[in-house]
Amino acid sequence: MNAIRKFMFYKQSDGKENRIYLSGELDLSAASSLANVLDSVVRKEEETLILDLKELKYIDSTGIGLIVSAIKVRAAMHASFQIDHIPAKVRRLFDITGVSSYLHNNGSLRENQRITERKEEII
């Protein structure tokens, strides 16, 4: 029996930060729904953008691409961005693809020009 892959997210906003909680499996079939919510908040430079991955079980290259896009936009704006509760399997993928090199150990975005200047190094 094949399990149905399910991805869910919910967003909390308080005027100072937008926190998006991700759970389940983020793959090509689920990416457009996350892309829509990210598009609605990623350019709000006065508010911290936080992705909470605590309940994320799986992420494919499409999902990683969405996160990389958010990193690039936030870095170009010098806006606050953070990824909280990165599961070990996802952390390993971030390490392999180079995404981790743009985050501090606590998941916050490094102040680093290489993010926007050397896009080919991410993924």
Question: Which ranges hold each PLM region?
Answer:
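STAS-like cytosolic regulatory interaction modules
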Residues: 1-57, 69-123
